[in-house]
């Protein structure tokens, strides 16, 4: 499921003038996946809190939640075409409202250890490279189909990311230096024999 979605998104990005390398593809796919994952996670946490009779405070304001700007749904559970931004409206929203809002988390966070600070740090370092709101809408719809509930789904996603980073290295592009072959990882673990509670300096 994830593999086909990644291929579909790469096809969309291939048509984008602002995306020319595997690194661009990975970066653009990453910020979209991150926001979708965060929205799903917050939805689960809110549901758990509700079941316990507790309240939950969302990290992301309602107006900037995935389910509002990226994939608003109608009563039938399908994309609400009347409320889904597209074209220039979508690009303007992402560049002028969403990214500045997310970047602002860095200043609003109480400490660097918080998720809020990390969100701000991430979005201070990247740029939306989509120039066509129609292409971005296509990518959003592909990503919205993904679910991150099971360990198997999360495991599949991690393997696909690893493959993308490996491909950047093979193509002599930036990012390949972040790929460590699994055989080397296993060898390092066998030599170091880390134990729970130990720290590496």
Language-model features: locations:
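Non-catalytic, mostly N-terminal accessory regions of nucleic-acid modification and defense proteins
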Residues: 1-196
């Amino acid at each position: 499921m994830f593999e086909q979605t990644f291929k579909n998104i790469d096809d969309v990005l291939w048509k984008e003038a602002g995306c020319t390398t595997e690194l661009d593809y990975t970066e653009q796919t990453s910020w979209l996946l991150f926001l979708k994952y965060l929205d799903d996670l917050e939805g689960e946490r809110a549901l758990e809190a509700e079941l316990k009779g507790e309240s939950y405070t969302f990290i992301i304001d309602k107006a900037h939640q995935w389910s509002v700007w990226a994939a608003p749904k109608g009563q039938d559970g399908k994309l609400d075409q009347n409320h889904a931004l597209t074209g220039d409206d979508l690009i303007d929203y992402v560049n002028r409202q969403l990214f500045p809002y997310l970047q602002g988390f860095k200043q609003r966070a109480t400490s660097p250890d918080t998720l809020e600070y990390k969100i701000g740090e991430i979005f201070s370092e990247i740029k939306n490279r989509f120039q066509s709101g129609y292409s971005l809408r296509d990518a959003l719809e592909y990503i919205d189909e993904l679910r991150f509930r099971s360990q198997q789904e999360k495991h599949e996603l991690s393997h696909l990311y690893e493959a993308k980073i490996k491909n950047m290295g093979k193509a002599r592009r930036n990012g390949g230096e972040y790929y460590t072959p699994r055989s080397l990882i296993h060898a390092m673990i066998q030599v170091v024999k880390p134990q729970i509670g130990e720290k590496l300096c």
